[in-house]
């Protein structure tokens, strides 16, 4: 096994060196938007959590004020982060060594999922790691990296007890991973599945009950976590995109038109996947299948419900192993994979041009602005495709359960 992954380990070292060179030479500012943060300051999203822990120790309500943070940003995550024990004399561990370790683990896990001797997989792996979402998540050391590692471990784990712990921590940290509780009912004996699924929801309801006041405070500061145009991974990005569409279509008509198109695309992909065998016989005994299903749920939910910064796109990785494994079994799956690769290339180039072309060159900048506005349309198409597949898997599973119940009755 290790011999087969020898090239992967060499590639891990290569990627980590390249990332270090990019960030140490401040080349990242032409690849990711700094969001009012100094180009010499790294791990800004993690720093605000550490500063909140410090201020909480000093007696501040960090959900309302956080003078310990350089930019006075409040705490907008679950209070579980504030339970992290902090020792001032080990500040370098919290602010430097821990982020570097997690980033190295993140990069390693990504690369080890690919067969780098295959050209398509090598290209996709490289594009994903150096994509604007991944670079932004790494540059800011956003805690989505921690959630990513918790959930990918939960998909890999065979223990519902372990999964219960991992998913609970992820949910208490960022809230949206609550949908990944579906993992708890995918495998195991019926009693075991019911017990841990029920225990999770009872625990989370109790947590939200005691956390309610803090959640209200978090939403008072929603400007800190709601992404602006160009930085968003959300259907809302289409409604504010700067393109010729806004000139010819009013906002309300654009919303209606977008929702109709989304429904139409979802229906098409739902219908197209009806006769695909791998979805007809879909089960959760396979790690890639579990990862794919959880990835579908998280990406679809975040896209249609929340207004996320585009580093949330790192969870699209969850669908890659399944698509790669089955790309030769069905042309639709293969085309979706190629579309994802094309989308990565387009986003990288358009984002680079957007960040490097001077605003003073208005005619050129205006055209690039329109170019960037194409990306939300690509997002819509991709998420609608994944939504159709998700609905098809759910429909097939429901049909399978109904047949089993009918068989038991007879």
List each language-model region with its residue ranges.
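Short amphipathic alpha-helix initiation/capping segments at coil-to-helix junctions
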Residues: 304, 308-313, 328-335
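Hydrophobic core segments of transmembrane alpha-helices in multi-pass, intramembrane catalytic enzymes
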Residues: 143-152, 175-178, 312-321, 379-383
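Aromatic-enriched
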Residues: 322-410
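Primarily membrane-embedded glycan-assembly and transfer machineries that use lipid-linked glycans
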Residues: 2-156, 160-162, 187-309, 317, ...
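Transmembrane helices and adjacent periplasmic/lumenal helix-loop junctions
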Residues: 165-186, 305-312
């Amino acid at each position: 096994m290790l011999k087969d992954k020898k090239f992967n380990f060499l590639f891990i070292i290569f990627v980590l060196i390249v990332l270090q060179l990019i960030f140490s030479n401040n080349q990242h500012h032409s690849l990711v938007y700094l969001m009012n943060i100094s180009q010499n300051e790294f791990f800004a999203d993690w720093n605000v959590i550490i500063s909140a822990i410090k201020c909480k120790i000093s007696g501040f309500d960090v959900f309302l004020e956080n003078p310990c943070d350089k930019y006075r940003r409040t705490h907008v995550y679950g209070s579980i982060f504030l339970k992290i024990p902090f020792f001032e004399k080990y500040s370098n561990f919290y602010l430097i060594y821990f982020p570097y370790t997690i980033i190295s683990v993140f990069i390693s896990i990504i690369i080890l999922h690919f067969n780098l001797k295959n050209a398509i997989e090598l290209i996709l792996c490289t594009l994903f790691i150096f994509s604007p979402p991944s670079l932004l998540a790494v540059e800011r050391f956003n805690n989505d990296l921690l959630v990513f590692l918790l959930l990918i471990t939960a998909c890999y784990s065979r223990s519902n007890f372990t999964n219960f712990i991992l998913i609970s921590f992820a949910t208490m940290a960022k809230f949206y991973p609550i949908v990944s509780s579906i993992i708890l009912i995918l495998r195991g004996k019926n009693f075991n599945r019911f017990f841990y699924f029920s225990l999770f929801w009872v625990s989370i309801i109790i947590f939200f009950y005691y956390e309610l006041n803090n959640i209200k405070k978090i939403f008072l500061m929603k400007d800190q976590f709601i992404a602006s145009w160009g930085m968003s991974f959300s259907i809302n990005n289409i409604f504010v995109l700067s393109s010729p569409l806004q000139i010819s279509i009013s906002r309300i008509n654009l919303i209606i038109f977008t929702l109709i198109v989304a429904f139409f695309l979802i229906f098409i992909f739902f219908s197209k996947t009806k006769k695909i065998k791998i979805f007809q016989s879909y089960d959760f005994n396979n790690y890639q299948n579990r990862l794919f299903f959880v990835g579908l749920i998280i990406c679809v939910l975040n896209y249609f419900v929340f207004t996320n910064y585009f580093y949330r796109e790192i969870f699209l990785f969850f669908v890659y192993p399944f698509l790669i494994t089955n790309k030769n079994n069905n042309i639709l799956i293969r085309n979706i994979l190629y579309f994802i690769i094309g989308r990565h290339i387009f986003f990288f180039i358009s984002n680079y041009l957007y960040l490097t072309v001077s605003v003073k060159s208005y005619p050129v900048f205006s055209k690039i602005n329109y170019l960037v506005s194409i990306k939300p349309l690509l997002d819509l198409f991709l998420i609608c495709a994944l939504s159709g597949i998700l609905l098809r898997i759910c429909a097939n599973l429901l049909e399978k359960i109904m047949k089993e119940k009918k068989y038991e009755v007879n």
